UniProtKB/Swiss-Prot annotation, chain A:
Name assigned to this protein: Protein TERMINAL FLOWER 1
Note: Mutagenesis of His-88 to Tyr converts the repressor of flowering 'TERMINAL FLOWER 1' into a 'FLOWERING LOCUS T'-like activator of flowering.
Tissue: Expressed below the apical dome of inflorescence and coflorescence meristems, and in inflorescence stem.
Compartments where located: Cytoplasm
Pfam families on file: PBP
Predominant place of localization: cytoplasm
Record bears the keyword Cytoplasm: yes
The UniProt record lists the keyword Cytoplasm: yes
Entry-linked InterPro entries: PEBP, PEBP-like_sf, PEBP_euk, Phosphatidylethanolamine-bd_CS
One GO term of the biological process aspect: meristem determinacy
Species this protein is from: Arabidopsis thaliana
UniProtKB/Swiss-Prot annotation, chain B:
Source organism of this protein record: Arabidopsis thaliana
Region of interest (Leucine-zipper), ranges: 191-212
Protein name (Swiss-Prot/TrEMBL): bZIP transcription factor 27
Pfam families: bZIP_1 (PF00170)
Location of the protein in the cell: Nucleus
Short motif (Nuclear localization signal): ranges: 152-159
Modifications the protein undergoes after translation, according to the UniProt entry: Phosphorylated.
Highest taxon above the source species: Eukaryota
Region of interest: Basic motif: 165-184
Gene knockout outcome: Slightly delayed flowering. In the plants missing both FD and FDP, fd-2 fdp-1 strongly delayed flowering, even in the presence of high FT levels.
UniProt modified residues of type Phosphothreonine: T231
GO terms, biological process: positive regulation of DNA-templated transcription; regulation of photoperiodism, flowering
Length: 177, 234
């Protein structure tokens, strides 16, 4: 947390997560997202098969009296060149106490595994610090056309305190790397 | 082998020299087809490089007739002279082209003169022939539209949509390339951060290890003295 300057969100800016999904923010809480002990780092590629079950999300910040909301979205639906369905909502967990992990929170939208069909998608985890503990039942008729900014305003979450994203494309896609 | 090499040379030469004359070009390539496959391919290459797409299609129509008419070496003379006999812009119908070749055999005339003397209005002649082209080969009309004056109305629409599509694809490709670069940059940035993080952590751990070593060493010393004192009784 000491070395969390603006540098930390550089990859988020370069990857246009800041801009497409979020406004500029200063990370203040450390969040670890890992699939099967493999930590998610910005811009890394993960295979859909390796993200089929929900990740472990640890919050290294706050205390047990502070509460956090986690949102996972895909801003590149159906494809990154024309994301007319953006954002696609994958997961919402609220009331996660600080210093714990997402399993201690309330899952209000169940985890949907990433299934990118067209192009390379970004999958973004955004963490907000709640002003107080509260139970929310977000009105989500469809996972498509979700808007993280609007959601944050609606539930008075303010700016994010942490975010991380990974890339994923079809399992069978031709990879150049 | 020798003769085929010679043909090769001749055909290449003609392909270069007659690039302005469409009908003779097609004739040359069909001749090449008669003589040898390799030469044919080379001629094609030349034609394709010159992006004279529609001659190929023209050619297909003319081929059988030419095959029947000129199967021998004798036509090579005519063939070489042909470009000079033909007026470059208006490609005359196939029958007339062969007649001209036969008549003027080795008497080359400057092409512009022919055009001017035979036709009062070059533009009209051109329009006529291109319309013939259109009629005989509808697929070629987009290419011929490039020559101007003709079929603007019909050509316009499809030409526009084609250009539009190409433009859109280009834009899309650029966006995609930009995204790809951004992805790479983000990935690199992240790796740099990770390196920096690991380096500081490594440095911290090294210092910690040093401190532990020192602590251990002093503890050992203390231990030793203790051991000696405890083994002292003997």
């Amino acid at each position: 947390m000491e070395n969390m300057g603006t540098r930390v969100i550089e990859p988020l800016i370069m990857g246009r997560v800041v801009g497409d999904v979020l406004d500029f923010f200063t990370p203040t809480t450390k969040m670890n997202v890992s699939y099967n002990k493999k930590q998610v780092s910005n811009g890394h590629e993960l295979f859909p098969s390796s993200v089929s079950s929900k990740p472990r999300v640890e919050i290294h910040g706050g205390d047990l009296r502070s509460f956090f909301t986690l949102v996972m979205i895909d801003p590149d639906v159906p494809g990154p060149s024309d994301p007319f369905l953006k954002e696609h909502l994958h997961w919402i967990v609220t009331n996660i106490p600080g210093t714990t992990d997402a399993t201690f929170g309330k899952e209000v939208v169940s985890y949907e595994l990433p299934r990118p069909s067209i192009g390379i998608h970004r999958f973004v985890f955004v963490l907000f610090r709640q002003k107080q503990r509260r139970v929310i039942f977000p009105n989500i008729p469809s996972r498509d056309h979700f808007n993280t900014r609007k959601f944050a305003v609606e539930y008075d979450l303010g700016l994010p305190v942490a975010a991380v994203f990974f890339n994923a494309q079809r399992e069978t896609a031709a990879r150049k790397r | 082998m020798l003769s085929s090499a010679k043909h090769n040379k001749i055909n290449n030469h003609s392909a270069f020299s007659i690039s302005s004359s469409s009908s003779s070009l097609s004739t040359s390539s069909s001749l090449g087809h008669n003589k040898s496959q390799v030469t044919m391919e080379e001629v094609w290459k030349e034609i394709n490089l010159g992006s004279l797409h529609y001659h190929r299609q023209l050619n297909i129509g003319h081929e059988p007739m030419l095959k029947n008419q000129n199967p021998n070496n004798s036509i090579f003379q005519d063939f070489l002279n042909m470009p000079l006999n033909q007026p470059p812009p208006p490609p005359p119908p196939p029958s007339s082209s062969t007649i001209v070749t036969a008549l003027y055999g080795s008497l080359p005339l400057p092409p512009p003169a022919t055009v001017l003397s035979l036709n009062s209005g070059v533009g009209f002649e051109f329009l006529d022939t291109t319309e013939n082209l259109l009629a005989s080969n509808p697929r070629s009309f987009e290419e011929s539209a490039k020559f101007g004056c003709l079929g603007k109305k019909r050509g316009q629409d499809s030409d526009d949509t084609r250009g539009d599509r190409r433009y859109k694809r280009m834009i899309k490709n650029r966006e995609s390339a930009a995204r790809s670069r951004a992805r790479k940059q983000a990935y690199t940035n992240e790796l740099e951060l990770e390196i920096a993080h690991l380096q500081t952590e490594n440095a911290r751990l090294k210092i910690q290890q040093e401190q532990l070593k020192i602590a251990e060493a002093t503890q050992n010393q203390v231990k030793k003295t203790l051991q000696r004192s405890s083994t002292a009784p003997f």
